[in-house]
Amino acid sequence: VCNLSAQPDQTASYLHIPVVDLDQDIARQVIVDREDGQYLGHPTTVLLEDGVTILAVYPKGHGRGAIVYRKSIDGGKNWSARIPVPSSWAASQEVPTIHRVIDPLGIKRLIVFSGRYPAKLAHSEDDGATWSELEPVGDWGGIVVMASLIPLNNGKSHYMAMFHDDMRYLTVDGQQAYDEDRKTNNNALFTLFKTLSVDGGLT
């Protein structure tokens, strides 16, 4: 989703993005989670190789908040209760993302990222039955880190992940850099970053 600031008469000739509105199609909607007075949203999911098992993670809050973890074994028609997770997941500061990766030895792994500074990573080697604690990936951070992760076409189980930041979370003093930049620039500069893994997502 993007925000286009051009005038309607300048964009009408080429911006014809089809819209599919399922708001009233209740038969196709599934309530995965609900809690009175609590914002729940921003889920990311991964479909396992059986084609029906879906794992979902999302924050208990708007962006930041404890990571909630749930599972469906029927393609998303029904969902488990909230599944217990390691204690460090309660301190997540950004929307978590979940991905399937396979290392050069053929070991299948699931990884969950949590953003802001420093970016953190947890992993599972039993299809999400158990997880490690969230641990820093490096001396950097970002907003919704690793929203996109793709395998590189080199046959070596290498991956590229991408994220963006507006100065605030890339470094330990990012907020200070951001505040200084606002004194001379009206709008924040968002920068796209990439990071590579050659060990099946562990680093």
What is each residue range found by the language model?
Residues 1-5:
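C-terminal segment of classical bacterial N-terminal signal peptides
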Residues 7-203:
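Asp-box/BNR beta-propeller blade signature and adjacent active/binding-site loops
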